[in-house]
Amino acid sequence: MAFAVLLDQVGSLGRFQILQLAFLCIANILLFPHILLENFTAAVPGHRCWVHILDNDTVSHNDTGTLGQDALLRISIPLDSNLKPEKCRRFVHPQWQLLHLNRTFSNTSEPDTEPCVDGWVYEQSSFFSTVVTEWDLVCEWESQKSVVQSLFMAGSLLGSVIFGYLSDRFGRKMICSWCLLQLAISDTCAAFAPTFSVYCSLRFLAGSCVMTIMGHSFLLVIEWTNPQSRSMVTTLLLCASSVGQMLLGGLAFVIQDWRTLQLTVSIPIFVIFLSSRWLVESARWLITYNQLDKGLKELRRAARINGKKNAGEILTIEFLRSAMQEELDAARSQASIFCLFHAPRLRMIVLYLGFVRLAVSVPLYGLIFNLQYLGRNIYLFQVLFGAITATARFVALLVMNYMGRRISQVLFLLPVGLFILVNTFLDQEMQTLRTILATLGAGVLCIATTSGSVHFSELIPTVLRGTGGGINILFSRIGAALAPLLMIFVGFSPYLPWITYGVFPILAGLVVLLLPETKNLPLPNTIQDVENDRKETRKVKQEDNCMKVTQF
């Protein structure tokens, strides 16, 4: 924890940290659209069966007389229960007699129908083309659309664990750069995918990178900043993700061809990858892993950018060894993923944080699915949701700095549960009130998740922060997968899934109370920092290190 002393020497929030933060914010803005891309590239437009008499360009007007499109549609496509044209069936033969019958007249004999053996005709008012129209993922193949999102989520789950572990072994910058390259290549190739299976495979590879890059961007910022600034930089990075949501809505509105949209959001990632060479590795991680020469080099680089001219004389190998002696001694025993669950206090923290992340993800994704019924303009909704979450992030910053990490989460998690429970029992006709409550719930959940992200980074030690982040994302992905599965309970009661969504954040709020407060405390570097009485240990060490700095 003596790294705070080193930060004071090089500048804990100067030009260096601002430049690093600005670059990673831009990266997050360009990265987040890749997570929600299937909202547009895999959207399902209105469709019906292809009909020879209606859609064959070689059929002359003389063959159909003076009949208009509506009349031809009526004799070719049966109506569903809502008196809308069927999406997956057509008449075997044109039913001319229907032209002389009232729509609601029930005939004694039902005309023969058949599946869409000749394909489908798609509406192009909202989407010119999507992967659904490209490979006809409708009707009996409709479930294939969810395969893309499931594989992307599976890739995210697997990548967060693997790359999280590797980042604790080989550094944040190296893994972040590799993931940027992998994402750029895989999603660019996805724009030219010849088959649906190839497209799914490429999106799986992309999914394994996106959350890893975003998670490591937090590490590369918070491990270079002082305790007072961590909540602010975390909030700014999360706000960048919200801006990315709004950017995606605007791009998708302008570019309605899925391949062009896929390519448009993928090419800039190559630029981010090439620019990542100027990222500075976490000196905290380098020193904790006994790479003193490299750590000293990065510290001097940060001091030079921050204008700390005298820092070069103070920052020496001997000074690093003296200030970080306890951390260096602890680094001799290599930490592994098993250490997260071996040390009793750390195990308790990891499990509590994991449950909170899971319990927040379940209602968050449940509300996202519900918010999609705000209207038919999906582009406007995407921009609106980004604006709501961005506003919520700034509210979170104010509350965190005033009330601390723990109380701020409890303050917002409990009302979320109440919003959902009240919404569950409101009459379906009260759409305006239901929409307001759902939107408030989503915004308040974003406040809680922002505070939770800061809380997590301040509880897990540096030697395992990447691995711990992977485990935390794993719990988040499990919660995201549970959200739609809970709708199975509708078969027992239409209220049961929503009651479950409401109970989860209430339980999460109670569990947060079991976690220690971390406001304005230095980051733990080793497992011993977490296991010991942290507040007392930190106070003594800071006083001792101040004496060492004075001596130098």
Curated annotation (Swiss-Prot):
Subcellular location: Cell membrane
GO terms, molecular function: transmembrane transporter activity
Pfam family, one: Sugar_tr
GO BP term, pick one: steroid metabolic process
Transmembrane intervals: 16-36, 146-166, 174-194, 204-224, 235-255, 260-280, 349-369, 380-400, 407-427, 436-456, 473-493, 495-515
Database matches in Gene3D superfamilies: MFS general substrate transporter like domains
UniProt entry tagged with the keyword Transmembrane helix: yes
Topological category with respect to the lipid bilayer: Multi-pass membrane protein
UniProt xrefs under InterPro entries: MFS_dom, MFS_sugar_transport-like, MFS_trans_sf
Sorted UniProt keywords: Cell membrane, Ion transport, Lipid metabolism, Lipid transport, Membrane, Steroid metabolism, Transmembrane, Transmembrane helix, Transport
Functional note: Renal transmembrane organic anion/dicarboxylate exchanger that participates in the reabsorption of conjugated steroids, as well as bile acids, driven by an outward gradient of dicarboxylates such as glutarate or succinate. Transports androstanediol glucuronide (5alpha-androstane-3alpha,17beta-diol 3-O-(beta-D-glucuronate)), estrone 3-sulfate, and estradiol-17-glucuronide (17beta-estradiol 17-O-(beta-D-glucuronate)), but not taurocholate.
Protein known as: Steroid transmembrane transporter SLC22A24
Organism this protein belongs to: Microcebus murinus
Encoding gene, per UniProt annotation: SLC22A24
